[in-house]
Amino acid sequence: MASTSSFDVVSDFDRQELVNTLDQVRRDVSTRYDLKDSKTEIVLEETEMVITTASDMTLQAVEDVLRAKATKRNLSLKIFDFQTPESVGGNRIQQVVKLRKGLSQEIAKKLSKIVRDELKKVTVAIQGESVRITGKSKDDLQAAIQLVKSKEDELDVPLQFENYR
């Protein structure tokens, strides 16, 4: 058995669940009476999605439907970074929603500092878009997981734990 144990802290989401969520949102928008004639389009790209609709009111309704469907499919709402809506031709409104994936250097440094300050028995290493936490005792790693979970709202990113060994 290894003398040290470790796990990775990552910020990721299941892309297929997002695709399924958007399918549900499109279906809901096309059948809902107040949104049926709004000609709403939702386009998913690699790092963002674009919502184009008729007015601010319908845009807000589509956002509400998106949040509700994402929550039901266990997607964190923190993956959505709603940008400012822009007016496009033909009295339509377009909103870009950036999808957060991976830990930025700034957030990784904050997370690393939080863990180092609170827990002395673990070591923290930033590895690209993830943070590896290593310790001799699995109890120390469990304490680190609890600490990171408690600080997740402060960091404003969805966090998952992988490669626990």
Swiss-Prot record:
Protein's UniProt keywords contain Nucleotide-binding: yes
Keywords from the UniProt entry: Nucleotide-binding
Molecular-function GO terms, alphabetical: nucleotide binding
GO CC term (a single one): cytosol
PANTHER family: UPF0234 PROTEIN YAJQ
Family: Belongs to the YajQ family.
NCBIfam families: PRK05412.1
Function: Nucleotide-binding protein.
Protein name listed in UniProt: Nucleotide-binding protein Syncc9902_1708
The organism of origin for this protein: Synechococcus sp. (strain CC9902)
